[in-house]
Swiss-Prot record:
InterPro entries: G6P_Isomerase (IPR001672), Phosphoglucose_isomerase_CS (IPR018189), SIS_dom_sf (IPR046348), SIS_PGI_1 (IPR035476), SIS_PGI_2 (IPR035482). Belongs to the GPI family. It comes from Carboxydothermus hydrogenoformans (strain ATCC BAA-161 / DSM 6008 / Z-2901). Pfam families: PGI. This is Glucose-6-phosphate isomerase.
């Protein structure tokens, strides 16, 4: 069964002046048609490669599956070294579709290697990883589209030294590079060393790359059916081609986001009611923030537009964030992820009936409780005039996860068209990169180093 998306709580009368009307959406039909035509043209010209990913050629799928089988047969650990989309996507899909205690399961129950995603350069984190893995039994999947990501390359240098000490000249057998098919230092190094590689299409940005080998190889290594993942994405791709705005999930969701953004809803909270979907909110945070947060529109005019992503988890954050969402500023749109059928059923025993707080729970299940709490939170927010909508999973499986990934990516593409911004670049990230290079003495960044060092801090504003 396919994902359902329930937009009722954007239009409900309870919202009063915070609601959208059907006329608001009808007024977007011309913009939608124009956006759909524009996106189709860019797709046909090969400018937006993520639209093609659900239709990955059979030979590419087979090669990913072959490599995954070899890793599963020969190695005890599989470590992703990457940052941003190179890490968030693999982690989100792994957590969604594998056992939540995956690494703690026995090797027999796992059926594959332990899985780690190292997406930060905190020295304590790297040191702790090296204490729990056996490098000689590990494959490191180094992922960077540009082949020049400083954080990822620093990790590569560290693990390469460790591997050389453990296995000598065979260290290359423990490396897989996922990068640009032609350009970049990582591609050049792979040619020099003879390292196994997978290609990220040049027309696919990092945050849109989960359905490339960036995400498909780690998924296959941990036993996920990547064919079903792609099949779900194809299903959603067809739905997102519909020419009626009211029937196009991505076009309609994007219109809702932009209309509410124009009315002051400058934050978008994603709140899954499933621990398995927790890291989907992390992945989506990059997708929304990096794609839509822009200073300039496509005409070069300053617009400073964006919708700040916020991550929450139901029911955990009912006890930390929901107070703010119900009684704080009217500046948020909430997106719930709901699961109709969880993969496990846990009964709450009917014990200690003399206590009312325990009696009413007995005989129910955790499944019933979490579903009730989601509906209750949804109601409370609606009553407090806070717009929200729900993405409903019949169950969490590779097919529905593939649908979700494509839906969110296509929604972002439509938002970019509606806002007249480039949703596929990230110029605001570049200044920090250049300053990092300068501070570490990279050649060619001497002037930038002087510029950075000119910025002084006043001791009087530093408390000791």
């Amino acid at each position: 069964m396919a994902l359902k998306i329930d937009f009722n709580n954007v239009f409900h009368p309870y919202l009063q002046k915070e609601r959208l009307g059907e006329a608001d959406i009808d007024g977007y039909k011309e913009k939608f048609t124009s956006a759909l035509v524009s996106l189709r043209e860019k797709k046909e010209k090969g400018e937006l490669g993520f639209f093609h990913l659900p239709y990955l050629p059979e030979e590419e799928i087979a090669e990913i599956e072959k490599t995954a089988r070899e890793v599963r047969e020969k190695f005890k650990y599989f470590v992703v070294l990457g940052i941003g989309g190179s890490a968030l996507g693999p982690l989100a899909v792994h957590t969604a579709l594998n056992n939540l205690r995956y690494n703690e399961l026995s090797e027999e129950l796992r059926g594959g290697p332990k899985f780690y995603v190292e997406d930060n350069i905190d020295p304590e984190r790297m040191a702790s990883l090296l204490k729990v893995i056996e490098p000689e039994k590990t494959v490191f999947n180094v992922i960077t589209k540009s082949g020049a990501t400083a954080e990822t390359l620093s990790q590569l240098l560290i693990v390469t030294e460790v591997l050389k000490k453990k296995v000598g000249k065979r260290f290359t057998e423990h490396l897989i590079f996922t990068t640009d098919p032609e350009k970049g230092s990582l591609r050049a190094l792979a040619r020099e060393l003879g390292v196994k590689t997978f290609a990220i299409p040049p027309n696919v940005g990092g945050r849109f790359s989960e359905l490339t080998p960036v995400g498909l190889l780690p998924a296959a290594v941990t036993g996920i059916n990547i064919r079903e993942l792609l099949a779900g994405a194809r299903e959603m791709a067809e739905r997102c081609e519909r020419e009626n705005l009211w029937e196009n999930p991505a076009g309609l969701a994007a219109a809702i986001h932009v209309l509410l953004l124009e009315r002051g809803k400058n934050m978008a909270v994603m709140m899954p009611y499933a621990d398995s979907l927790k890291y989907m909110a992390d992945w989506y945070a990059q997708l929304l923030g990096e794609s839509i947060g822009k200073r300039l529109n496509r005409r070069g005019e300053e617009v400073f537009v964006g919708q700040t992503p916020v991550k929450a988890l139901g029911v955990t954050d009912q006890h930390s964030q929901v107070q703010l969402y119900t009684e704080g500023p009217f500046d948020k749109l909430l997106i719930f992820l709901e699961v109709e059928r969880y993969r496990n059923r846990v009964v709450i025993p009917p014990d200690f009936p003399q206590y009312a707080e325990l009696k009413f729970l007995g005989g129910h299940t955790l499944n019933e409780l979490i579903i009730a709490e989601k509906k209750a939170t949804e109601f409370a927010l609606l009553k407090a005039r806070r717009p929200n909508y729900t993405v409903i999973f019949p169950e969490v499986n590779p097919y529905t996860v593939g649908e979700l990934l494509y839906f969110l990516e296509a929604k972002i593409a439509f938002m970019g068209e509606y806002l007249d911004i480039n949703a596929f670049d990230q110029p605001g990230v570049e200044e920090g990169k250049k300053a990092t290079y300068a501070l570490l003495g990279r050649e060619g960044f001497e002037e930038k180093r002087q510029e950075v060092l000119k910025v002084k801090k006043e001791p009087r504003f530093i408390l000791e």
